[in-house]
Amino acid sequence: MARIIALDGAQGEGGGQILRSALSLSMITGQPFEMSGIRAGRAKPGLLRQHLTAVRAATEICGAQVNGDELGSQQLRFTPGPIRGGEYRFAIGSAGSCMLVLQTVLPALWFADGSSRVEVHGGTHNQAAPSADFICRVWEPLLARMGINQRTTLIKHGFYPAGGGAAATVVEPAASLRGLTLISRGETRRITAEALLASVPHHVGEREVATLEAHFPRAEKNVVALEGGCGPGNALSLMIQSEQLTELFAAFGVKGTSAEAVANQVAHEARRYLASPAAVGEHLADQLILPLALAGEGAFTVARASAHLLTNIAVVERFLPVTFNLEEAREMVQVMVSKKDSGS
């Protein structure tokens, strides 16, 4: 029997990413794991609905044996079986992030025995999670360059606290994964400011994109009023398309926060990205660690190595025979991954 990998859920930034990465890697490598202190670094520790859905989705996709899969649990034991392609549907039962559930199981389905379709119901545009727009416009185009055939479709927008959204991904098994190198982003080709409004007055979106335009005069503006009772909710994004990749920065309207404050939050993050010579933003960097590790090669630059990034690297290195090297240079960090020397 494969050895059980013991993981401390409180390590590093102590969030749900440790669990999601462990589930993905356990399914792919066949190595079971035990985790204690799940989300110990959070105000509400233990498994929330979103994390529990990710655990149960992983369990169904690989026929795993699992202990500790209940709300609030800070302990989990997961013993995977073979990954099975097919049609899957999961409901979070809250406004928890559909995208984080998808990002847990999709890497495993790159190695499945056939094509798959995964549909998840919950939130699609959440604080502290990649939005559906980020997945479709930023992450998946980079995965395609690595040889991964995956396409996500937004079925219905879902915002906190109501949820009610849905997204589905169709994925084919990958013959092999290629490395990816993102050292420089190249020239900026296009900037787009977009406000999504669901049961929110139109002037809110107009003020948001106007504020972004003041920061980025080249930006194209788009205000979208969503139909179908998916609100209330408001998401603002700034998409920056460069020669080598697309980045997207987002913030969400909150009661008591002005449209201008929401826009300034996005502008601050985007300006910080553009002021750095690094190719990749801080959040995208987190999303690249697992696919690059599975490819066994690749490199990117990021303005700084966040606690989230370092924690994710530490988990990946427990499951895969790869090594990450980080080198600081010229106001940025270069992150490189390579396969471990078989003699080491």
Curated annotation (Swiss-Prot):
EC number annotated for this UniProt entry: 6.5.1.4
CDD domains (alphabetical): RNA_Cyclase_Class_II
Residues binding ATP: Q103, H283, L284, A285, D286, Q287
Gene3D superfamilies assigned to the protein according to its UniProt record, in alphabetical order: RNA 3'-terminal phosphate cyclase domain (3.65.10.20), RNA 3'-terminal phosphate cyclase, insert domain (3.30.360.20)
Any GO BP: RNA processing
Pfam families: RTC, RTC_insert
GO molecular function, one term: RNA-3'-phosphate cyclase activity
GO cellular component terms, semicolon-separated: cytoplasm
Active site: residue positions: H308 (tele-amp-histidine intermediate)
Catalysed transformations (reactions): a 3'-end 3'-phospho-ribonucleotide-RNA + ATP = a 3'-end 2',3'-cyclophospho-ribonucleotide-RNA + AMP + diphosphate
Assigned keywords, A-Z: ATP-binding, Cytoplasm, Ligase, Nucleotide-binding
Residues in coiled coil: none
Subcellular location: Cytoplasm
Family that this chain belongs to: Belongs to the RNA 3'-terminal cyclase family. Type 1 subfamily.
Reported function: Catalyzes the conversion of 3'-phosphate to a 2',3'-cyclic phosphodiester at the end of RNA. The mechanism of action of the enzyme occurs in 3 steps: (A) adenylation of the enzyme by ATP; (B) transfer of adenylate to an RNA-N3'P to produce RNA-N3'PP5'A; (C) and attack of the adjacent 2'-hydroxyl on the 3'-phosphorus in the diester linkage to produce the cyclic end product. The biological role of this enzyme is unknown but it is likely to function in some aspects of cellular RNA processing.
NCBIfam families cross-referenced by the UniProt entry: PRK04204.1-2, PRK04204.1-3, RNA_3prim_cycl
Name of the molecule in the record: RNA 3'-terminal phosphate cyclase
Gene: rtcA
